Regions:
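Terminal accessory carbohydrate-recognition/targeting modules of carbohydrate-active enzymes
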Residues: 1-267, 302, 309, 320, ...
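An acidic intrinsically disordered interaction segment
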Residues: 78-90, 185-195, 266-287, 325-337, ...
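The feature captures the catalytic groove of carbohydrate-active enzymes
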Residues: 194-216, 230, 237-239, 342-365, ...
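Extended, well-ordered alpha-helical scaffold segments
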Residues: 244-264, 270, 274-281, 323-337, ...
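Aromatic-lined, polymer-binding surfaces characteristic
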Residues: 271-278, 284-292, 304-307, 334-367, ...
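Active-site flanking loop/helix segments enriched in acidic
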Residues: 295-302
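Alpha-helical support elements that line or immediately flank enzyme active sites
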Residues: 302-338
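Hydrophobic core/packing positions within alpha-helical solenoid repeats
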Residues: 315-318, 366, 370
């Protein structure tokens, strides 16, 4: 679907989310027997041929791409999954392909706290000389939109094994694609047109998208050899110096990710296979909010960002059950900074606009989250944290709900809370079409 890709970068966390690196397509070419020569890769005739942009005679080609396209009104498929022998996920994604005498292992992970996607390849070539061709597919679109060829306007530069793309719409931002080795050449066609996204089709749209692929990278795989290849795609400031891929390889980032995942399990303290998967899944919803400098919860992922009600409902499971005390405190602080007239924000828009406050229950859920925090951490430090940072806001909420605040929220004589009137949408059932509120909860 449109929300998926190897790297969706947040330019102003947690908003302004752009798909920048859609995927990478791989193919393996096995060369014919006459392509022989020096055992030294630098002086091998195939290496020289590839540098000249020519293609040696091949005996077999294995296309590992798995995708779906719309062509001439028909749905077409590439069948790379036929070579896939295993898949696993442990915080990183792991594929193993078997193509003839070549075993290719592909590991994908994201660098924690950065807009960086790392791909680590391990290749065992037990057959004759061969090559790996990589075709990266780029984009620069809002994560729920789609693209056409006319949408791509990049300033492109290629220095050694570093390809830099600067979108004209965001000249202060650059997409940096780097490989540890390989020969870059122009890719034809330059656009991957009419890729069909099946989930979007199921939602009764055409589900068509387009990606930008100006270059391909060819890596020589000598006979009877083992190789490790690093690929990085990063979003950096346009004036930032290129990083050295040899100083922080994809394999280094993969190891960092393994350590981070292990630390999540240790912090949670739950030694159970199923619980570990929940701990790992919970981590994906926690992120930084630049406007506060604290953590928040992407409770509406992938469609929405941090909603007050959803965040407070998810708060206990995501942070307290997993032992993430500091993150729990930061989330409470994030929302405390935006309380207005005694109301916790309903949502933070995805365009850096001011929060919306049309909610009757987010503030009440906030009380519940604070209470849960104190139940999990019944110590002096927790009491002090709440007393100093949270308690004044709780009093503000009580006063506002008692005496009356926005959206007709006030306490009736019987002690029950009245909320909403007219066109107000103040509960989770908030559908409104023009002047018609579908399910008013006033």
């Amino acid at each position: 679907r449109t929300h998926q890709g190897y790297l969706i970068a947040s330019l102003h966390p947690p908003i302004e989310r752009y798909l920048v690196f859609s995927k990478i397509n791989e193919s393996l070419s096995v060369f014919a027997a006459e392509n022989t020569g020096s055992s030294d890769e630098k002086f091998h005739p195939i290496t020289d041929t590839l540098k000249k942009g020519s293609v040696p005679a091949v005996s077999a080609v294995y296309n590992l791409e798995t995708s779906q396209h719309k062509k001439n009104g028909e749905t077409c498929y590439t069948q790379g999954q036929e070579y896939l022998v295993s898949f696993s996920y442990d915080g990183s994604v792991h594929y193993t392909y078997q193509a003839g005498d070549i075993t290719l292992k592909k590991h994908i992970c994201l660098k924690h706290g950065a807009n960086v996607c790392a791909i680590a390849y391990e290749i065992e070539n037990n057959g004759p000389d061969a090559s790996l061709t990589l075709v990266p597919l780029f984009n620069f679109r809002e994560h729920s939109a789609s693209s056409r060829p006319e949408d791509f306007h990049f300033r492109t530069s290629l220095i050694d094994n570093s390809l830099c793309l600067i979108p004209e719409s965001h000249p202060d931002t650059a997409i940096l694609f780097q490989t540890s080795e390989g020969i870059f050449s122009d890719h034809t066609p330059m656009f991957d047109i009419d890729m069909q996204l099946q989930t979007e089709v199921d939602l009764e749209t055409d589900g068509l998208d387009c990606h930008y692929c100006p270059h391909e990278v060819t890596v020589f795989l000598p006979a009877k050899s083992h190789k490790q290849i690093s690929v990085l795609c990063s979003v950096i400031a346009a004036d930032e110096t290129f990083t050295d891929i040899t100083a922080d390889t994809a394999f280094d980032i993969l190891k960092e990710r393994e350590k981070y995942t292990k630390s999540l399990y240790e912090t949670a303290g739950i030694h159970d296979d199923f619980a570990d998967r929940l701990v790992l899944a919970a981590d994906q919803f926690l992120c930084d909010r630049a406007s506060t400098g604290y953590k928040t919860v992407l409770a509406g992922l992938p469609w929405f960002t941090d909603w007050g009600r959803d965040t407070m409902i998810a708060f206990t499971g995501l942070t307290l059950c997993t032992g993430r005390r500091k993150d729990a405190e930061e989330i409470l602080l994030t929302f405390s900074k935006y309380i207005r007239h005694g109301i916790v924000p309903n949502m933070f828009p995805d365009d850096n606009a001011a929060p919306l406050y049309n909610t009757a229950d987010a503030s009440l859920w906030y009380f519940y989250a604070v209470w849960q925090y104190l139940q999990y951490y019944p110590d002096t430090a927790a009491n002090a944290f709440v007393q100093e940072n949270i308690y004044p806001h709780l009093k503000e909420i009580i006063s506002a709900y008692k005496n009356g605040t926005d959206f007709s929220i006030y306490m009736e004589e019987d002690g029950l809370i009245h909320a909403g009137s007219g066109l107000d949408q103040i509960t989770w059932m908030d559908v409104r079409v023009g002047d018609w509120v579908a399910t008013p909860r006033h």
